[in-house]
């Protein structure tokens, strides 16, 4: 697979590194040619195509892709709960569980943790989203949430985005403790959430299928937890019990092949994001984090 490099900050080392982008030549065709853009739009709006993509990744023959993928992207297989030969397909590996101690959870009731492995951008104020535009229009929180009243609650709040790359651990977790309501689904298209695509078009967040869960917490208020699906029609899977009390770090669900973004929304004066994440985000740099690390602290006046 051809690859193009993209810069990010490794949070553990503080160094700027290069992410190898999967299928960048194909993506370049889709975004830089008229024929490619037309074909891409048709394919991603076709539910049959999305189902075929998902079905292909569940075929047993795809298990032979696992070892080369692990080697190329230097995935730490020692963290996985099962050995490589136990995975029946590439999708089985994609949704793998980790050993219980593989992702320590940052302790403290006043600390919100990162919900997934991935590349993070944080926006202490929704006004900071002005650097993202959709067809020369500001990002619409109302369109994203599909609910004007809900959007109003977060309009002056804060936002964190976690982009999961294909080589990441693809189970997502609760960043705080609290009562988690039943997810609300917003149907939409299934455009790719590829980093090169996002640089050209942030619109996928308001067009793609997504699921919204409200978590009520004493420390952080009502937090909106949004999973954004992509490519594979059945990519978002919830594993928690709606209406129940959830612990910080507990598994919430997983993305099958194709789903790849988690967005957290906080009401005003509820969280202070960690300074390193804020600083790098202001420079337009994503920060690669592991699930369970500190995202921010409860706001205190």
Swiss-Prot record:
Pathway: Phospholipid metabolism; phosphatidylethanolamine biosynthesis; phosphatidylethanolamine from CDP-diacylglycerol: step 2/2. Signal peptide: none annotated. The record marks 259-260 as: Cleavage (non-hydrolytic). Keywords: Cell membrane, Decarboxylase, Lipid biosynthesis, Lipid metabolism, Lyase, Membrane, Phospholipid biosynthesis, Phospholipid metabolism, Pyruvate, Zymogen. It comes from the Bacteria. It is a peripheral membrane protein. Is synthesized initially as an inactive proenzyme. Formation of the active enzyme involves a self-maturation process in which the active site pyruvoyl group is generated from an internal serine residue via an autocatalytic post-translational modification. Two non-identical subunits are generated from the proenzyme in this reaction, and the pyruvate is formed at the N-terminus of the alpha chain, which is derived from the carboxyl end of the proenzyme. It holds the Pfam family PS_Dcarbxylase. GO terms for biological process: phosphatidylethanolamine biosynthetic process. It catalyses: a 1,2-diacyl-sn-glycero-3-phospho-L-serine + H(+) = a 1,2-diacyl-sn-glycero-3-phosphoethanolamine + CO2. The keyword rRNA-binding does not apply. Its EC number is 4.1.1.65. The active site is at 117 (charge relay system), 173 (charge relay system), 260 (charge relay system), 260 (schiff-base intermediate with substrate). It is found in: Cell membrane. GO terms for cellular component: plasma membrane. Heterodimer of a large membrane-associated beta subunit and a small pyruvoyl-containing alpha subunit. NCBIfam families: PRK00723.1, PS_decarb. PANTHER family: PHOSPHATIDYLSERINE DECARBOXYLASE (PTHR10067), PHOSPHATIDYLSERINE DECARBOXYLASE PROENZYME 2 (PTHR10067:SF17). Belongs to the phosphatidylserine decarboxylase family. PSD-B subfamily. Prokaryotic type II sub-subfamily. Catalyzes the formation of phosphatidylethanolamine (PtdEtn) from phosphatidylserine (PtdSer). This is Phosphatidylserine decarboxylase proenzyme. It comes from Chlamydia trachomatis serovar D (strain ATCC VR-885 / DSM 19411 / UW-3/Cx).
């Amino acid at each position: 697979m051809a690859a193009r490099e993209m810069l990010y900050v490794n949070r553990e080392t503080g160094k700027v590194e290069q992410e190898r982008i999967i299928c960048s030549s194909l993506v370049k065709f889709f975004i830089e040619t008229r024929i490619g853009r037309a074909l891409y739009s048709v394919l991603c709006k076709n539910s049959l195509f999305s189902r075929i993509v998902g079905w292909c990744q569940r075929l047993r023959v795809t298990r032979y892709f696992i070892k080369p993928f692990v080697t190329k992207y230097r995935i730490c297989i020692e963290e996985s709960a099962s050995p490589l030969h136990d995975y029946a397909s590439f999708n089985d590996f994609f949704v793998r569980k980790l050993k219980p101690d593989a992702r320590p959870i940052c302790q403290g009731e006043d600390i919100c943790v990162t919900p997934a492995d991935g590349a993070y951008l944080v926006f202490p104020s929704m006004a900071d989203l002005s650097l993202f535009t959709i067809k020369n229009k500001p990002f619409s929180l109302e369109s994203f949430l599909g609910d004007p009243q809900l959007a109003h609650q977060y309009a002056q709040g804060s936002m964190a985005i976690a982009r999961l790359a294909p080589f990441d651990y693809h189970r997502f977790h609760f960043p705080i403790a609290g009562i988690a309501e039943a997810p609300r689904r917003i149907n939409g298209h299934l455009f790719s959430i590829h980093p090169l695509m996002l640089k050209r078009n942030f619109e996928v967040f308001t067009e793609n299928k997504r699921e919204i869960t409200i978590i009520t917490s004493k420390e952080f208020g009502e937090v909106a937890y949004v999973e954004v699906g992509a490519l594979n029609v059945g990519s978002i899977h919830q594993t928690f019990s709606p209406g129940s009390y959830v612990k910080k770090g507990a598994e919430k669900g997983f993305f099958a092949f194709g789903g790849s973004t988690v967005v957290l929304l906080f009401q005003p004066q509820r969280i202070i994001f960690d300074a390193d994440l804020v600083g790098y985000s202001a420079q337009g740099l994503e920060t690669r984090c592991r699930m369970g690390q500190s995202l921010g602290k409860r706001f205190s006046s």
